[in-house]
């Protein structure tokens, strides 16, 4: 299972498990990942957890901004549409920095495969 780890001075402060199907992120207490900080919108972003279409037993994670005031960024690029998260991506929600970690993807990087048409 993948995680989203909040970083403070490049050290992990808090880790959240992404056990979907949809993980809601924001300031409101009803979110799965609650960030009580002024730069975060009440319903800031969400991560969809979906089975991979090609590799049975693997999972993909897609992040979307939910029309937040200060935006959602992946690797310093502001999201304008849904984006797939990759292992070690850096996610910024308001002024808060997170690292996306997917240990299963890390294992798959060592495996080559050919898709049949």
Regions flagged by a language model, labelled:
Residues 12-15:
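Short, mixed charged/polar active-site loops
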Residues 19-90, 95:
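Forkhead-associated
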Residues 1-6, 55-59, 96-117:
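Regulatory inter-domain linker segments that are low-complexity and enriched
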Residues 9:
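Structured interaction and signal-relay segments at domain junctions
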């Amino acid at each position: 299972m993948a995680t989203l780890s909040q970083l403070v001075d490049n050290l992990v402060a808090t880790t959240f498990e992404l056990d979907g199907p949809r993980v809601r992120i924001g300031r409101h207490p009803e979110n799965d990942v609650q960030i009580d900080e002024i730069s975060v919108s009440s319903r800031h972003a969400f991560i969809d957890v979906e089975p991979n279409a090609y590799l049975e037993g693997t999972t993909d994670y897609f992040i979307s901004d939910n029309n937040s005031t200060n935006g959602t960024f992946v690797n310093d690029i502001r999201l304008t549409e849904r984006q797939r998260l990759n292992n070690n991506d850096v996610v910024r929600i308001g002024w808060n920095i997170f690292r996306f970690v997917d240990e299963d993807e890390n294992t798959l990087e060592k495996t080559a495969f050919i898709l049949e048409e």
